[in-house]
């Protein structure tokens, strides 16, 4: 099995592709199949979130480009910017991962959120599309102010790979 543990910024060529939906692009340890059919193990730094277009380098030097897979999402539009901002506010208040486009919002399919959005008077359309939600205003993971008081203990990497 091919090991992939390095994210790189540039490459002169791409040797293979890795097509994954967003929920799998959030995992740092993952067993995957590349577009060529090659089985690989992602062993990335904890907290790494892959985005479409990211480049990875395998242990044998191959460069693999990440492709955001089409997945079931809801596309939200509104008659006015205020209505769209109101929908974004209510989704953000629920900590919903959200992709923000020019005049639209995109979120993972959820019938409860769809009903809420329709109740707000916006248009909601189910579609298959790549999902690239905002990374968050503060970057990284969820933290609290008291986290800085605790000693920093680096946990050893586990060898478990998600299927």
UniProtKB/Swiss-Prot annotation:
SMART domains in alphabetical order: UreE_N
A Pfam family reported for this protein in Swiss-Prot or TrEMBL: UreE_N
- Annotated family: Belongs to the UreE family.
GO molecular function annotation? nickel cation binding; unfolded protein binding
> What is the purpose of this protein?
Involved in urease metallocenter assembly. Binds nickel. Probably functions as a nickel donor during metallocenter assembly.
Q: Where in the cell is it found?
A: Cytoplasm
Gene Ontology CC, one term: cytoplasm
Protein name per UniProt: Urease accessory protein UreE
Query: Mind telling me which HAMAP family this protein's record contains?
Result: UreE
The domain of life is Bacteria
Sorted alphabetically, which CDD domains does this protein's record hold? UreE
